[in-house]
């Protein structure tokens, strides 16, 4: 299947979505920081054979408006609600990776009537961390952007499926390849998240939840155990030989885990 572009507007901010169509329960896919909806293409196609699938370019990223004035976590949550409302989506399954997973957790906690199930990929509720924005800015500063070619970008981002997934998020201008986001906006978004504690939000989530982790996860086993103790029902699974972007690295495995989880939810 192919996707259709859908545009949602909330408080003057345009949010661009890839609507893959499909029948059955609705899945809303949320990418991570500095990402784009196209990251989900390898998953969205197969998933749309059994589900309605919508992938969102979150505010400030991808094809959505690049300079929103509000990049608080509240804004990202209300964007998800607006996408569901304006596209007529009810009782959705939220699938989010990294910062998209964080937005998914907060949405499920604050809008339980909207979310029937939650798939969190390489994400945690987090907490105050004053060093995090500096770390992210240094990471962006390390990018040799603009890239001389798409191939150069693929190699910089590690090659293979992960490198291609990140390179697909760039845009070609004047023979060079540029990020489709503003670095300061992304750092500001992280800074907002780093100022607050969201631990209580995890315990407010009431829907069935799958926590999907990479073998080389930034979330420690002890932290996973804590999350599992604090909230039931939650399932966790670690995917062997994967890193943070496992949805790019092993989309077939991620697809199988999501499908199996949702079959149990529907049973």
Give the predicted meaning of each segment.
Residues 176-230, 235:
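Conserved serine/cysteine hydrolase catalytic core
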Residues 34, 58-62, 125, 243-246:
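Alpha/beta-hydrolase active-site loop signature
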Residues 11-13, 41-48, 54-95, 99, ...:
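Active-site loop/oxyanion-hole signature of alpha/beta-hydrolase fold enzymes
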Residues 1-27, 49-51, 89-90, 233, ...:
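Alpha/beta-hydrolase fold catalytic core
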Residues 24, 32-35, 98:
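Active-site glycine-rich loops that stabilize anionic/oxyanionic intermediates
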Residues 130-133, 146-196, 201:
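Conserved alpha/beta-hydrolase catalytic His-Asp/Glu region
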Residues 242-251, 255:
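Catalytic histidine-centered segment of alpha/beta-hydrolase-like enzymes
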Residues 105-109, 116-146:
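Flexible "cap/lid" loop of the alpha/beta hydrolase fold
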């Amino acid at each position: 299947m192919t996707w259709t572009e859908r545009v949602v507007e909330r408080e003057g901010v345009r949010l661009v979505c890839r609507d893959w169509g499909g029948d059955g329960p609705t899945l809303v896919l949320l990418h991570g920081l500095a990402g784009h909806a196209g990251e989900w293409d390898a998953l969205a196609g197969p998933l749309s054979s059994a589900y309605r699938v919508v992938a969102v370019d979150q505010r400030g990223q991808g094809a959505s408006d690049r300079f929103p004035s509000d990049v608080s976590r509240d804004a990202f949550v209300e964007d998800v609600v607006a996408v569901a409302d304006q596209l007529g989506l009810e009782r959705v399954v939220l699938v989010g990776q990294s910062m998209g997973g964080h937005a998914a957790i907060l949405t499920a906690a604050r809008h339980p009537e909207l979310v029937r199930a939650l798939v969190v990929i390489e994400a945690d509720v987090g907490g105050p961390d004053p060093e995090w924005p500096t770390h992210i800015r240094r990471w962006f500063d390390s990018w040799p952007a603009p890239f001389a070619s798409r191939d150069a970008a693929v190699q910089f981002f590690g090659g293979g499926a992960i490198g291609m997934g990140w390179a697909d998020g760039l845009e070609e201008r004047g023979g060079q390849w540029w990020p489709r986001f503003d670095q300061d906006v992304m750092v500001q978004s992280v800074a907002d998240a780093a100022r607050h504690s969201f631990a209580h939000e995890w315990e407010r989530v009431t829907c069935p939840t799958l926590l999907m982790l990479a073998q080389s996860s930034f979330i420690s086993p002890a932290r996973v155990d804590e999350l599992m103790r604090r909230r039931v029902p939650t399932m966790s699974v670690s995917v062997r030989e994967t890193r943070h972007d496992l949805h790019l690295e092993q989309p077939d495995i991620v697809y199988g885990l999501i499908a199996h989880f949702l079959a149990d939810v529907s049973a």
